[in-house]
Structure formats: structure tokens, C-alpha cells
Amino acid sequence: MFDTVCTLPLSADLFAQAIHPKEPIVSVGLASGHVETFRLPSDEVDSDDDQASTSSSRNGRGHIDTMWRTRRHKGSCRCLTFGIDGESLYSAGTDGLVKAAKAETGVVENKIAIPPEKDGSVDAPTVIHALSPQTLLLATDSSALHLYDLRLPFSRVSARPQQSHHPHDDYISSITPLPASDTSTSGFSKQWVSTGGTTLAVTDLRRGVMVRSEDQEEELISSVYVGGLATTGTSRGEKVIVGGSSGVLTLWEKGAWDDQDERIYVQRSGGEGESLETLAMVPDELGRGKMVAVGLGSGGVKFVRIGPNKVVSEVTHDETEGVVGLGFDVEGRMVSGGGQVVKVWHEAVGSGANGASAGEKHMLGDSDEDSDDDDNDDSDDSDGERRRADEAKRKRKKGKGKDRSGGQHVMAFYDLD
């Protein structure tokens, strides 16, 4: 299905990655505090003049443009998310600030101060998610989950969260919104699933924490929602898939949150499982059914078909650095990030008998030029800040990133034809 990989080198370790909901745009947050936004080549043909560039894009030779780059945070940028409409990009850093910027230009429009720890130290962010045009969710190292009203302009008073919860005993590792109910008037989600430590929890926008699962006796790291499954017996055809630290995916039936429903063994190595760091649903038209892409701590990406519940294919993002970011853009291309590299995997144009075709890998080294347009309150890098950035890495630390440009990578889904 995918055969060509474009490799985009970064200037520092990748901590966060966000994909625009409506345009072929990817943003990254780095250990150095920088935030960079790139526009990927489009496969759409608007005129005859675009035919040549479109052909190049499909073969992996399109040009990736740097839209903007700035040192957004003093310390590391821990997490990123686009707003529902894609107009804003929210970043959170170990400087204790959330900044809302125009996605197109990077100009900061609003700031939010993260509530500090009881001793006054920074409570570093772990996950950020725009639930609706009005509500922003922010999780932190202390296990706090803050809800902010985005309609309020910035001030020292309005910067305080409207609600705060503690759905877990440990830091929150993932947030997955549940679809709005059929009776919803806004169409936006009002409930979400979170993972933290060894538990899963469901929180409601109005009612707070509704339920917390039993202790799963392993760390729960990542999560994603999947709907449209077969409805059998008590199953509604909706599940949340959770990735754990032991290489196992667990499936949770919506509405039955006490304990997991099914288990899928994804990665085992030497008797120990590899952590499943990030999950993304493969678009139905590409996966030919329900399929989840799983980013591993070992640097691979595995593809698991839901239903048969088995691994059908895998690719390698990096041989040593774990996959931190994973998702699909509006044109169906997979974007994986980890270490000091982001890779864009294109859909194969002429797949062979096994679903693969020969492809080339291209280094787009001119995309990482510095054009810093820092905020007024940002400062230059210093050794001390870099040390703090290193210390602020997630608890499942994966070592220092390296700029690699290995051999050809081809993705083949052998059982799909």
C-alpha cells in the first residue's frame, strides 16, 4: 500500500507531533523548545501546470516546505495539538506554559499558565487535546487533568482551568475522545478515555470522572477509538484500543470500562514485550477494513487488523529510536516521527502482486533551515536549558536521537489482495 518514504531531518529530538485535520501540514515539538511546521506536497491536481509536481509528489520527490519555525518554549516542547478547525496550534512545554498560535504563521494569540505543583515547581505537561472549539484538555506529570475554556481571552485570572480532575494515580499518558451521542446538539465530544499508570478512566465534561478500570498490572501508554465493527451479542461495534508496556494491545468495549475485552500480542522480544508508544487508525480506504498502526518503542511500526486481531505487516521507522508520533494526513499518507527524523510514507501508485512496488527514499535536507522568529519572552539556548530539556523527557526514555538515513523502506500488506 505504501512504498516510498521521504525523510525529514530535525535539529533536536522529537517530543511531539501533530497532523493538521484539513490540510497536508505536520507540526513537530522538539527537545530544544522549538516548534516547526511543514507543508507536505499535495497530490491534488488543480491545473495542468500542477501535473508535473503532482507526479513527483506521488513518487516521493515532492518538496516539503518549512512554513515557520520558532523557539516556542524555554525548555522542551512536550506536546502539540491542532484545534478542531485546524486554525490554531496549541503547544505545551516544560516552562509551564501553553501557547496558542496561528497554524499558518506561528504567531502566538493566547497563553495559558499550567498550575504548578504544591511546592511551586513546574508540573510538566504530558498530553494536550482540543476537545471542541471551546474546550482544551491538558494532562500533567502529577496526574492532573485540567479543562480550559478557549473562549476566554488571556489574563492572569482567565488562565486558570475551569475544572481539574485526577482520574489516575500516575501521570496521564493518552487521551482519546469518544464520539458525540446521537442526541448531541453541538456534534462535539463531551466524554473521553484516558490512560495513566495501570488504569483506564472515562471522564465527562459535566460530571467529571465517571469510572476507572481495575488495575491492569501493566503500564497503559496509548489509546485510539475504533467504530463500525460488527455488532454481535452485547457488542455495540465500538471499542477503545489501548497499547501497553508489554507489547500487548487490549480492546475495551464501549460502556464496559471495568476491564479489557480482548488481547492482541503485537511485539515480544526475548520473553519481554516492547512498549506500544502510539496508535493511529489506518484510513478505511487504505486498510481495507479496520486496521490500527502501532508505533513501537523499538522503532518499528506494526499494522494490526481488527477482527482477526493479528499483525499483518510492519515497517521500520528507525532501528534504535522509538516512534513518538504516528498518524495519517488528509491525503492518506502515514507520518511517523521519532529520534531526530520524521518520515512520510506515500501510498503506492502501482502495487505489485504482494501489494508493494519499488520505491526511493529522499532526504529533504533543505527543509530544516533556521528562520527563528521567537516570541518576545523567549530566550536563546543555553546549556542549562538543554540539561533541563533532557531531564524533562518522558519516563520511558529512549536514548539520544540520531540523524539517520538508512536504506529503502517498503510497506507491503501481504494478505490484503
UniProtKB/Swiss-Prot annotation:
Keywords: Nucleus, Repeat, WD repeat. GO terms for cellular component: nucleolus. It is found in: Nucleus, Nucleolus. It comes from the Eukaryota. WD repeats lie at residues 72-111, 117-158, 221-262, 318-355. Coiled coil: none annotated. Residues 41-64, 352-417 are annotated as: Disordered. Residues 366-383 have a biased composition (Acidic residues). Residues 384-393 have a biased composition (Basic and acidic residues). This is WD repeat-containing protein jip5. SUPFAM superfamilies: WD40 repeat-like (SSF50978). The keyword Nucleotidyltransferase does not apply. InterPro entries: WD40/YVTN_repeat-like_dom_sf, WD40_repeat_dom_sf, WDR55_POC1. Belongs to the WD repeat WDR55 family.
